[in-house]
């Protein structure tokens, strides 16, 4: 698990809740507002995307909670070890090696099978491009969701204000109605800035690191 992601997410919500106070939490919960912001913004995001992109985004979003990215120095050490084995015992000796990195395993497998350098570069380069596209689609989906959420929050606030102004005959109801109307704006800001946009940025960063690691593996394998 990626500890930084867990601490950041729980810490952000913890600070918001502590600012509100547990005894006041009931005043900040409104189901229609939740539906407008969370469900409404998701529906609009689906409208501008596709179901496949949504399912792919949910899948890659899980990467933000995992810490599977290897350090470049660890990859270099492993590649040096494989080079030493190949030099002493031949390429075929690499076939029995336990390789946890799927990309490196494919690169070594192609090398052992006798694939030429151009074929390895083209095949693995295409795999990198497909991976980057998949990650980009996931990051773009959450970026779009984060862009739409505040707008849906504002729509919810306007709906609440219209309903409030339509019931001005009871002055005592104006304050509570105004508070409920403003909740959708708060929900939109939280959904965008605490959840969607951080996930989008983290996916982009992880994609860049993973692509750099894959390039390193290609260079190390063909050296």
Q: Could you tell me what each predicted segment is?
A:
Residues 2, 7-25, 127-207:
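Helix-termination/interfacial motifs at the ends of transmembrane alpha-helices
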Residues 4-7, 14-139, 210-223:
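Large intracellular
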């Amino acid at each position: 698990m990626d500890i930084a992601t867990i601490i950041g997410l729980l810490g952000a919500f913890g600070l918001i809740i502590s600012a509100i106070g547990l005894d006041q939490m009931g005043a900040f919960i409104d189901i229609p507002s939740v539906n407008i912001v969370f469900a409404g913004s998701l529906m609009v995001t689906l409208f501008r995307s596709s179901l496949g992109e949504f399912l792919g985004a949910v899948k890659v979003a899980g990467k933000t909670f995992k810490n599977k990215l290897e350090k470049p120095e660890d990859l270099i050490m492993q590649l040096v070890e494989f080079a030493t084995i190949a030099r002493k015992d031949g390429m075929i000796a690499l076939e029995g090696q336990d390789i946890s990195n799927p990309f490196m395993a494919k690169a070594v497998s192609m090398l052992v099978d006798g694939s030429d350098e151009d074929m390895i570069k083209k095949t693995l380069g295409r795999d990198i491009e497909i991976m980057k596209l998949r990650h980009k689609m996931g990051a773009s989906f959450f970026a779009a969701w984060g862009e739409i959420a505040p707008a849906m929050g504002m729509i919810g606030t306007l709906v609440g204000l219209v309903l409030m102004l339509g019931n001005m005959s009871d002055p005592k109801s104006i304050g509570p109605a105004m508070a409920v109307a403003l909740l959708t704006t708060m929900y939109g800001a939280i959904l965008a800035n605490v959840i969607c946009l951080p996930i989008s940025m983290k996916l982009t960063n992880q994609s860049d690191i993973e692509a750099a690691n894959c390039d390193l593996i290609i260079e190390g394998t063909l050296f």
